[in-house]
Amino acid sequence: MRNKKWISLAVAVVLTVTALPATVFAAKDGESKEELTKVTLNEVAHSIFYAPQYVAIEEGYFAEEGLDLTLVTGFGADKTMTAVISGEADIGFMGAEASIYAYQEGATDPVVNFAQLTQRAGNFLVAREEMPDFTWDDLKDKRVLGGRKGGMPEMVFEYILRNHNIDPATDLEIDQSIDFGSTAAAFTGDMSADFTVEFEPSATALEREGKGYVVASLGVDSGYVPYTSYSAKTSFLNENPQIIQSFTNALQKGMDYVQSHSPEEIAQVISPQFPETDMDTLTTIVNRYYEQDTWKENLVFEKDSFELLQDILESAGELEKRVDYEQLVTTEFANTAIN
């Protein structure tokens, strides 16, 4: 498979994953940490896009479920998958395409998705100038700072382009050479780029600095897409079903919270996770995701969503052979968490 060297390395070797300072969440109501089960979660990025997860952390839902959670940021699905395969992390949070790549590379202990958090893409198309009448045809013959080849941000972007009869290879120039998290700085410094595809808070930051303007939401224009999900090795799922169930229960509580509270309330709760983001900006970003129906009501990863994901991979030329839904998805824990 083209451009899958990273996942081959993930299957073959153990790498050290760069982490944010480890965050341990203590129990409430006088419960000692010794009574909690330690679990390490490696997230693909630390983003407001994943608000329900941070609500679950800040509201103490993991501790309520008997878990002492350590959160690590992998800074990329390749690194997050490596951490899961190597055993550095018990659970990974990333695009489900990574589990498909690993499976097709011959993983002997497949990484299975057990909960889906987001149902839309979380990035935005940013232009240098305001474009109130923007259409996707405006990208023709332009230069865009995109994402890593084979990653969900780039594939969803290309999926939208194809849906608008735009050939990503010939109708525009997409720069895929810039590391995740560095595109906003590159856009500011490289005036040859006409557009950039950005997650929050970079999109809002560019707007507030007057250096860019959001002209389209990839989440809205791509439709409902299984963008990010939680996964673990088959062996871990089989040996630790109660840990996975408790973890999923805590997440469902976070999902319930965001469905029943305002963006202002959500922003207030998750603010300790983003100390460098002021409350006004945080609220603006949460509201942007809230209004486009980013988060599911439950964590069930439906078959139709998995098939759509594979359609996107196929259209991007990143899928050698389709994988059966039952091989890489289980809904047992998410369905139980609903009740």
Across the structure, where does each feature detected by a protein language model lie?
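Predominant activation on well-ordered alpha-helical scaffold segments within soluble catalytic domains
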Residues: Y54, I100, E158, T204, ...
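Pocket-lining segment of extracytoplasmic ligand-binding domains
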Residues: E129, G181-F274
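Secondary-structure end/capping motifs
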Residues: N238-E320
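Soluble non-cytosolic domains of exported or imported proteins
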Residues: S47, G74-D78, F93, G151-M152, ...
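Short, low-complexity disordered leader/linker segments with a strong preference
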Residues: M1-K38, T336-N339
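Conserved C-terminal helix/tail region of periplasmic/extracytoplasmic solute-binding proteins
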Residues: L309-N339
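Short, glycine-/small- and polar/acidic-enriched structural segments
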Residues: G30-A169, E173-D179, A186, D194-E200, ...
